[in-house]
Amino acid sequence: MVATVVGTRVESLASSGIEAIPKEYVRPQEELTSIGNIFEEEKKENGPQVPTIDLEDLVSEDEEKRVRCHEELKRAATEWGVMQVVNHGIPIELMERVRAAGAEFFNQSVEEKEKYANDHASGNIQGYGSKLANNASGQLEWEDYFFHLVYPEDKRDMSIWPKTPSDYIPATSAYAEHLRGLATKILSALSLGLGLEEGRLEKEVGGMEELLLQMKINYYPKCPQPELALGVEAHTDVSALTFILHNMVPGLQLFYEGKWVTAKCVPDSLVMHIGDTIEILSNGKYKSILHRGLVNKEKVRISWAVFCEPPKEKIILKPLPETVSEAEPPLYPPRTFAQHIHHKLFRKTQELGAK
């Protein structure tokens, strides 16, 4: 049995004592067969596992170690498009501060969080929100979120940043700055992996001035019927790179070789996705992998996704000339980042309308 409730926060639904989730949250029948118990899925040792890449030697003076690290990164980006990265250079205590600040924000009452509510109708996408049923299926996801631009500093709107807890702004700001430095290192290594100059990919996605870091804190409340719902439906990221921190509760699944693979919770790691932007620039040599988020009955899951995105209109995304040949013609038409986002939304609406 399912209930019908629309226009409320998922957290409010979850804490109301419902035993059946509203029908808007129930996934289509063809998806339900692949949704399992995430804790059981995480324990599985057989089958493919998301690669873990040690970045300690990413910029090592020792050429042999550096080359080995770059090769492992390239292999993961080529074969998977996602990896767990360790020894990434971001202080563990800073990651803990970010986790604590985000959790404390979401531990406030819904009424308190509503002070930061976004308003898609008026174009204010930053702030506290939930998925709107604005697609052809009317489908909803079992999550609330907080979304805001965190870097560069001069493009931030501090009026929307949480004032409580007091460490939210300093911790998140420092974390964003560290991630921006890590993005440069990763983009350099990925450039070299394509036979390009090391600064090339960063330049193509906007450079130090224009590459934007957008943070989305995903809050997945406990779900009474996790076998029927998804926290985030299957998608690829439009970004260049995405870095994900989480609270060590499993949920992320990757669609690899025709099957859903659960990412294990690796201590002190970040999950890093290659996004569509890098897939396009590399002419498909680096992969943007399809992924989704499962929910559970027992534990709240929180993840901090930071999307490194090019400017929406200034840059034309297309395969770089060096990645194209007679044998490997361009796989993607030229588009701005905004056009790529629009194309994905339009295509999804078309697919839903055809069902």
From Swiss-Prot:
Keyword Metal-binding: yes
UniProt keyword list: Dioxygenase, Flavonoid biosynthesis, Iron, Metal-binding, Oxidoreductase, Vitamin C
Sequence intervals crossing the membrane: none
Class in the EC hierarchy, top level: oxidoreductase
Cofactor descriptive note: Binds 1 ascorbate molecule per subunit. Binds 1 Fe(2+) ion per subunit.
Protein's pathway: Pigment biosynthesis; anthocyanin biosynthesis
GO molecular function annotation: L-ascorbic acid binding; leucocyanidin oxygenase activity; metal ion binding; oxidoreductase activity, acting on paired donors, with incorporation or reduction of molecular oxygen, with 2-oxoglutarate as one donor, and the other dehydrogenated
Amino-acid positions noted as binding 2-oxoglutarate in the UniProt annotation, renumbered to this chain: N218, Y219, Y220, R301, I302, S303
Substrates-to-products reaction catalysed: a (2R,3S,4S)-leucoanthocyanidin + 2-oxoglutarate + O2 = a 4-H-anthocyanidin with a 3-hydroxy group + succinate + CO2 + 2 H2O
Record-linked InterPro entries: DIOX_N (IPR026992), IPNS-like_FE2OG_OXY (IPR044861), IPNS-like_sf (IPR027443), Oxoglu/Fe-dep_dioxygenase_dom (IPR005123), Plant_2OG-oxidoreductases (IPR050295)
Listed cofactors: L-ascorbate; Fe(2+)
EC number from the UniProt entry: 1.14.20.4
Domain named Fe2OG dioxygenase: residues: 211-310
Entry coiled-coil feature ranges: none
Expressing tissues: Expressed in stems and leaves. Expressed at low levels in ovaries.
Biological processes per GO annotation: anthocyanin-containing compound biosynthetic process
Highest taxon of source: Eukaryota
Entry binding sites for Fe cation: H235, D237, H291
UniProt cross-references to PROSITE patterns, sorted A to Z: FE2OG_OXY
Function: Involved in anthocyanin biosynthesis by catalyzing the oxidation of leucoanthocyanidins into anthocyanidins. Required for the accumulation of anthocyanin in red-fleshed kiwifruit varieties.
Family according to the record: Belongs to the iron/ascorbate-dependent oxidoreductase family.
Cross-referenced PANTHER family: OXOGLUTARATE/IRON-DEPENDENT DIOXYGENASE
Stated name of the protein: Anthocyanin synthase
